[in-house]
């Protein structure tokens, strides 16, 4: 379930555009007005506001927000205002364009996250947006930017179009659990069978396969993968893929937790988790967070951030400022 709260009566896109224009006109910026408009509009409404703003004022709202706002608040508002497919395409492009030594494993996990926690239609939209924005296919850019074992996995995951209904086949699950087990025992995590299964089967079928794996071999597949010798980075990305496929809400609960735990805050990761899930399943993420860490996600977040950034994030969490 989503957490954002859209008012019962919403102004027209033209009226919202005027409110935003007034909020950034002259000296100073009315950040609260920006939050009240954009933070309480759904994807379709935000798209219409952006279109209306361009028609009326001849400027891209994204460009205006980027120039008038600053810091983590600006990045969060801009990310939220983008069409989701464009947002994810730009996020992946930023990761792939980093210098080789700066392409950290944590960055690459974001590509896995996008590939394994979004709908088939959204992933297609991301690939289309990528081609349109960057004159390259997402798959080509991955293949040319990363070493073979990692590129092979990420291209497979990013190029999939999964069946999205909940029909499953128990016999297929048993057979493919055995194929996965064999590949792990042979220390072949990049075996074609592994990639074929993870890259073609529906989310529901894969979950059935993971259940069959635990039932037949007495251990979860992610633990078996974790104990497999070989490429540590490949092993880590496979574990993230399995986690995202099996329990996406737990994955994002962990992203939130990791972003605020310890010294300092990883605002980029926190923003990504909240912005990308606020219209999808952030309510479930909130519940999983409590189950996993025995504390309120909202309280943990708000105790770690401040200012306009905090006001915007709590608005996406469903609170009023």
UniProtKB/Swiss-Prot annotation:
The modification Phosphothreonine is found at residue 117. Annexin repeats lie at residues 11-82, 83-159, 171-243, 247-318. The keyword Zinc-finger does not apply. InterPro entries: Annexin, Annexin_repeat, Annexin_repeat_CS, Annexin_sf. One of its GO terms (biological process) is response to salt stress. Expressed mainly in roots and flowers. Lower in stems and leaves. This is Annexin D3. The modification N-acetylalanine is found at residue 2. One of its GO terms (cellular component) is plant-type vacuole. Ca(2+) 1 binds at residues 26, 28, 68.
């Amino acid at each position: 379930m989503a957490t954002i709260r859209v008012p019962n009566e919403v102004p027209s896109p033209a009226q919202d555009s005027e409110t935003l224009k007034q909020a950034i006109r002259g000296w100073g910026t009315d950040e609260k007005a920006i939050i009240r408009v954009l933070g309480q509009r759904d994807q379709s409404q935000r798209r219409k506001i952006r279109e209306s703003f361009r028609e009326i004022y001849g400027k891209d709202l994204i460009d205006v927000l980027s120039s008038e706002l600053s810091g983590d608040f600006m990045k969060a508002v801009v990310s939220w205002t983008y069409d989701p497919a464009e947002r994810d395409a730009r996020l992946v492009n930023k990761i792939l364009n980093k210098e080789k030594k700066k392409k950290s494993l944590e960055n690459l996990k974001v590509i896995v996250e996008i590939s394994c926690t979004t709908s088939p239609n959204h992933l297609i939209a991301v690939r289309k947006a990528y081609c349109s924005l960057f004159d390259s296919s997402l798959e080509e850019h991955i293949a040319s930017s990363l070493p073979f074992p990692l590129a092979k996995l990420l291209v497979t995951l990013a190029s999939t179009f999964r069946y999205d209904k909940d029909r499953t086949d128990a016999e297929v699950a048993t057979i493919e659990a055995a194929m996965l087990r064999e590949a792990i025992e042979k220390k072949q995590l990049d075996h074609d069978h592994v990639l074929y299964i993870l890259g073609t089967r529906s989310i529901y079928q894969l979950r059935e396969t993971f259940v069959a794996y635990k039932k037949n071999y007495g251990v979860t597949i992610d633990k078996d993968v974790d104990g497999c010798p070989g490429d540590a980075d490949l092993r880590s990305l496979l574990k993230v893929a399995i986690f995202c496929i099996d329990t996406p809400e737990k994955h994002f609960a962990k992203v939130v937790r990791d972003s605020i735990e310890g010294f300092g805050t990883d605002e980029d990761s926190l923003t990504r988790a909240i912005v990308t899930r606020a219209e999808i399943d952030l309510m479930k993420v909130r519940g999983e967070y409590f189950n996993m860490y025995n504390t309120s996600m909202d309280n943990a977040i708000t105790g770690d951030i401040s200012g306009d950034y905090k006001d915007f994030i709590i608005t996406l969490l469903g609170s009023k400022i």
